[in-house]
């Protein structure tokens, strides 16, 4: 361990260029096992109502952007997990010094709780214990086994760690939701691999760069001026420029908000699965015109299913339009405008701002009350999903990509209380679709993929998708 400490490089202060094509190209490859046989056709044993977990694992294990990142960066990932060990485990019951029933050795618990914690304090045994208690290391180990041989794996170790997260939300043998499993796995990997980095964004618009430079110059100038007339003159001029360059101003604001989000804890998991939505609320008073802009990250879109005539066919675009439709804030939901300080009837608009590498779409078949399941058929494209119709009209960066190809479908068969989850996944290096249904695996034809049981769709951006 000491030898690893001496030879490894620290990455804590590296800067990251979000959306860097060079990084993408390095992992944008098929999983290669040195064999001409198709690999990754592995079943997962159901350990007692764990089909929800198995289906999420199969979807993630056949996401080649994720798989290649995990496999090709294993050493750095392990180092990050060990570096972050105190942050990951210091609030975990098993790692508390006062615990009387913890399976973790007392000496290791003391190291984790120490404010002076460092990798050099760890023994080989410590390293193994720590890694065995992380979702990320367990999922790498599981996926390596799944891709090494076409077999059936029994995910006992992963299940044990997975059952401990979210205050043991998944503990026991109750049925849960596949979306909850997916979200939990991604969130835990983000947390475990989070690093402080300096984040940069590259604009494709010269005017945006000029605006950001001007804005920074104004901030520097204002910071040196005393409160008074001269400062007011500078700020009033800036406000005029801002009004004249609304798109540049909004883009600069988005960079600022996204920078904060990524710098709170950067990981490549976040970059793969995260996109941004832009919400705006505008005051209707012509004398005011104040607009509140907000940018929010997402790792999946949870889409309501519109109410339609029973004879009208639904498609994923109907659901996207419903999700991104404008909302009137009236009656008991009046908006308190920060500009005129009045409660007004305003319009809230929400649109996509940036698109993730992997777009995950959930159909809300169970609703808020979970009284019944909506079994209606929803059509969705396999070869090209184009989300350009729900991109914010103020977004004018050329780098925003809007077309996707389907990679995976998590299906839910049956009713609300007696359903079963299984997965259709595309094997990226052959283009063939397979069904993964707990221990069962088998080829399926394309006409099976778009089906009434579809619950969660996984799309990969077309500009990242390898041609067959």
UniProtKB/Swiss-Prot annotation:
Active site: 51, 420
Pfam families: UCH
InterPro entries: Papain-like_cys_pep_sf (IPR038765), Peptidase_C19_UCH (IPR001394), Ub_carboxyl-term_hydrolase (IPR050185), USP_CS (IPR018200), USP_dom (IPR028889)
The keyword Protease is assigned to this record: yes
Catalytic activity: Thiol-dependent hydrolysis of ester, thioester, amide, peptide and isopeptide bonds formed by the C-terminal Gly of ubiquitin (a 76-residue protein attached to proteins as an intracellular targeting signal)
Keyword terms: Hydrolase, Protease, Thiol protease, Ubl conjugation pathway
GO terms of biological process kind: protein deubiquitination; proteolysis
Keyword Heme: no
Gene3D superfamilies in alphabetical order: Cysteine proteinases (3.90.70.10)
A GO MF term: cysteine-type deubiquitinase activity
Domain of life of the source: Viruses
The enzyme's E.C. designation: 3.4.19.12
Sequence ranges assigned to domain USP in this UniProt record: 42-462
PANTHER family for this protein: UBIQUITIN CARBOXYL-TERMINAL HYDROLASE (PTHR21646)
Family in the record: Belongs to the peptidase C19 family.
Name recorded for this polypeptide: Probable ubiquitin carboxyl-terminal hydrolase R319
Source organism of the structure: Acanthamoeba polyphaga mimivirus
């Amino acid at each position: 361990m000491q030898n690893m400490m001496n030879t490894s490089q620290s990455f804590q202060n590296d800067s990251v260029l979000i959306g860097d094509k060079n990084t993408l190209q390095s992992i944008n490859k098929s999983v290669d096992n040195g064999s001409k046989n198709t690999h990754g056709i592995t079943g997962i044993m159901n350990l007692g109502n764990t089909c929800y977990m198995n289906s999420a694992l199969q979807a993630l294990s056949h996401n080649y952007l994720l798989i290649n990142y995990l496999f090709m960066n294993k050493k750095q990932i392990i180092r990050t997990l060990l570096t972050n060990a105190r942050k990951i485990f210091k609030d975990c019951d098993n790692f508390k010094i006062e615990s009387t029933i913890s399976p973790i050795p007392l000496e290791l618990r003391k190291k984790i709780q120490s404010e002076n914690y460092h990798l050099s304090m760890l023994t080989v045994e410590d390293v193994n214990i720590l890694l065995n208690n992380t979702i990320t290391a367990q999922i790498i180990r599981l996926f390596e086994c799944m891709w090494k041989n076409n077999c059936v794996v029994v995910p006992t170790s992963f299940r044990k760690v997975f059952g401990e997260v979210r205050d043991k939300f998944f503990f026991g043998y109750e049925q849960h939701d596949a979306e909850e499993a997916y979200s939990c796995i991604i969130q835990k990997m983000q947390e475990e691999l989070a690093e402080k980095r300096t984040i940069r964004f590259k604009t494709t618009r010269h005017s945006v760069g000029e605006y950001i430079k001007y804005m920074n110059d104004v901030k520097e100038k204002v910071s040196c001026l005393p409160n008074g007339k001269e400062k007011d003159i500078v700020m009033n001029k800036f406000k005029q420029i801002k009004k004249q360059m609304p798109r540049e101003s909004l883009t600069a604001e988005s960079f600022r908000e996204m920078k904060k989000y990524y710098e709170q804890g950067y990981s490549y998991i976040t970059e793969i699965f995260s996109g941004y939505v832009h919400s705006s609320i505008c005051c209707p008073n012509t004398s005011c015109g104040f607009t509140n802009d907000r940018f929010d990250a997402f790792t999946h879109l949870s889409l309501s299913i519109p109410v339609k005539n029973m004879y009208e066919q639904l498609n994923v675009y109907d659901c996207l339009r419903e999700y991104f439709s404008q909302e009137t804030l009236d009656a008991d939901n009046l908006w308190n405008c920060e500009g005129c300080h009045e409660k007004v009837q305003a319009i809230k608009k929400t649109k996509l701002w940036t698109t993730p590498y992997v777009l995950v779409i959930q159909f809300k078949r169970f609703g808020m009350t979970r009284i019944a399941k909506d079994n209606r058929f929803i059509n969705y494209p396999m070869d090209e999903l184009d989300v350009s119709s729900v991109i914010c009209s103020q977004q004018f960066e050329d780098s925003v990509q809007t077309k996707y190809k389907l990679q995976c479908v998590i299906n839910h068969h049956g009713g609300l209380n007696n359903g079963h989850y299984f997965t259709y996944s595309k094997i990226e290096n052959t283009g063939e679709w397979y069904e993964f249904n707990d221990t069962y695996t088998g080829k399926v034809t394309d006409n099976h993929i778009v089906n009434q049981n579809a619950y969660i769709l996984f799309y990969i951006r077309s500009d990242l998708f390898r041609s067959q």
